[in-house]
Structure formats: C-alpha cells, structure tokens
Amino acid sequence: MTRAHNATLESIQYARGTLRLLDQRKLPFETVFDEILTVDDIWTAIKEMRVRGAPAIAVSAALAIAVAAGNELKKNDGACNSVDGTRRFLLESCDTVMTARPTAVNLSKTLIRLKRDIADVTANTAGGLVEACAVLAEKIYAEDVAYNEGIMRHGAAHVTQLVKKSKVSVITICNTGALATSRYGTALGVVRQLFYEGKLEQVYACETRPWNQGARLTVYECVQENIPFTLICDSAVSALMGSRPIDAVIVGADRICRNGDTANKIGTCNLAVAAAHYGVPFFVAAPSTTLDPMTADGESVVIEERETMELTHNMATQQRVVAEGPSLRIWNPVFDITPAALVTGGIITERGVLQPSATAPFFDITRIVGAS
C-alpha cells in the first residue's frame, strides 16, 4: 500500500498560473524555491540542474510553458495577443526548452506530445488556448504521479518474488525519488515500497560524483522518512558486493533504447558490471515515458558532457581542488550506457515488468510502448 505523500519532499509547487521549483543544488542545507515565470526561467533551471531527474524535468517543463504563456498573455504587447500568436509562442517554447538537456528522453517526448496536442486544440481566444495548454500540462503532471505508484507496486512485487527473501538489501545510485519525479520516485520509489511493506533490510546509496545526488538528495529523502540506509562512495560498490549480502541493484534511467540499453547517471554501468560479477540481480525502474523505441541501442544516444569545473572544484564551496597545468585534460560525461545484457533483473515500468530474454536481443521495449 502506498503511503500518503511526504510534503517535505515536494520539489514542484504548482497551482494554475504559478510554478515554483525547489533548487536542488542547495539541498540538504537550504530549502529554496525559485519562481518560474518565463521560458528562459525553466530553460535555465533545467540546464543548471536546479530541477533534475528525467521525469521531474519533463513535468516541470510542461507546466512552466503553460505558466509562461499565461504571463505573456497579460502583456499588452506580448507574443500571446492572438490565437495564432499564442499557438506560435507555445510551439516555439517547446522547441526552446527541449534543448536544455539532450540525454533524458522524457523531456523531448513530453514536449513533442505537448506540441502535437497544442496544434490540435481548437480555441476561439488566446486565453482559451493558454487554458487548454494548462489542462494538457496538468494531465502530464497527474500521469507522472500515477506512473510512480505503478512502478512502486510492480517493482516491489517483482524484486521480492525474484529474490525470495523476507527482507532485501539494495544498492542504488543518484537520486530517483520524490525529488526527481512528481511524487514518490522510480528506483527509489521501489525501495520506498519495500520499506513501507516491511521488506527492506538496508539501502546502500552511492554518493554519485560529481554532483553528489546520492549523498545530498537520496540520503535527504531517506532521513526524512526514516528509511534504513548506508552511504557509500561510488568506488566501494565492488567491495560491498564482495563482503556483504546484497540482494539487488535498482537504478533509474534517463533513456532506455529499443534493445534495453540504458542511459543513466555516470557510474551506473560500473554498478552493473560489478553486479554481474557477483551474481546480484540488476533492475532498471522507469516510467514508459523513458522508453525510446526510436533509438535502436546505446551507441545512438547523445551523452551530455558538463563543465570541467564540476571535477576541478568543490561543488559546495566552489574552491578549486585540482592543480592547474597545460597537460591537464578533463572528461566529464554525465551519463553512461549500461548494456541490456547486464540488466539481469528486468525493466520495471508502471505497466509491468519487462524480463530479459536468455539471448540477444535481451529486450524489446516495443512490447510496452509500440514501435513509435
């Protein structure tokens, strides 16, 4: 049974016409909500990782575009002074926001859907079109909450059935909980459900360098709900699996290709390789909006690379901690690709669980989302 939502973990505050997003860069020490008024505001919030997590990015983008259009409508000389102008503003806003982060497919899929639906809306006034956009965005928001609940339910049942233990110990990476989604989470949502059902022994949270989403955000969520956890550095996962009873690795995803190859936070593939070596089932938990049947495999995924200072500086103090010199080279990919062959436990979605085949191709996600 899903528990009531913990409002402390709310990262999206929305009411028709207003949107405030939790600046997750400042957690766990400060709780600061930024008001989102314009398209530039949401593009910057996504790009600068004030809002993060593939589902949360997509939902926030849709809501923000509706809010931005409403604010534009209030201007006498704004872009939304006619039905045609409003439609053009909404469609162009979707295109702009889509460029903020390239790897997470939820953002592009959600905004492509919003564009299609806006193009189909029949409205007699600019205000009517803005209201229709708000209704569409609110539907996307509500759907993500339902997706969270389905993933939790299917995931907890599948993990306990496969592991066959009364209590399980789990490793996860990054933050895939309420802060990364609209409500409960994906991979951390499954962990939550195991905890709610009294079936969680311990969750081991990887710190997740360089942004430390595991240390800052996953630990924050576990503390808020008294979930039993242990924080580990990313490089400790093999030692952990080799020395303590670990029953499952559960991770989220930013894009799952047609064959099951999974783009997720850098370090996920390391986890999968270690899990395969030690015989630990490896699960991916994500909503169907993360499934990308148009991308055949991981080789086709564009991997975002971020600023070098994320590695050369302490992210909290902004103090440089790496020596400078002409021979210094830095590579800072945000995501890696976990081959489908290493997703041994299955892909958990709100619609059920895709279990791997014994031979390649190990998955065919079109069984859930169709070919396009």
Swiss-Prot record:
Entry annotated with the keyword Transcription regulation: no
Catalyses which reaction(s): 5-(methylsulfanyl)-alpha-D-ribose 1-phosphate = 5-(methylsulfanyl)-D-ribulose 1-phosphate
Family: Belongs to the eIF-2B alpha/beta/delta subunits family. MtnA subfamily.
Taxon lineage: Eukaryota, Discoba, Euglenozoa, Kinetoplastea, Metakinetoplastina
Keyword line: Amino-acid biosynthesis, Cytoplasm, Isomerase, Methionine biosynthesis, Nucleus
EC numbers, comma separated: 5.3.1.23
Cytoplasm as UniProt keyword: yes
Residues spanning the signal sequence: none
Organism: Trypanosoma cruzi (strain CL Brener)
Database matches in PANTHER family: METHYLTHIORIBOSE-1-PHOSPHATE ISOMERASE
GO molecular function: S-methyl-5-thioribose-1-phosphate isomerase activity
Any one Gene Ontology BP term: L-methionine salvage from methylthioadenosine
Name of the featured protein: Methylthioribose-1-phosphate isomerase 1
Disulphide bridges: none
Pathway assignment: Amino-acid biosynthesis; L-methionine biosynthesis via salvage pathway; L-methionine from S-methyl-5-thio-alpha-D-ribose 1-phosphate: step 1/6
GO CC terms of this entry: cytoplasm; nucleus
Catalytic center residues: 254
Principal place of residence: cytoplasm
UniProt subcellular location: Cytoplasm; Nucleus
Enzyme class, first EC level, given as a word: isomerase
Function text: Catalyzes the interconversion of methylthioribose-1-phosphate (MTR-1-P) into methylthioribulose-1-phosphate (MTRu-1-P).
Annotated site, Transition state stabilizer, chain positions: 174
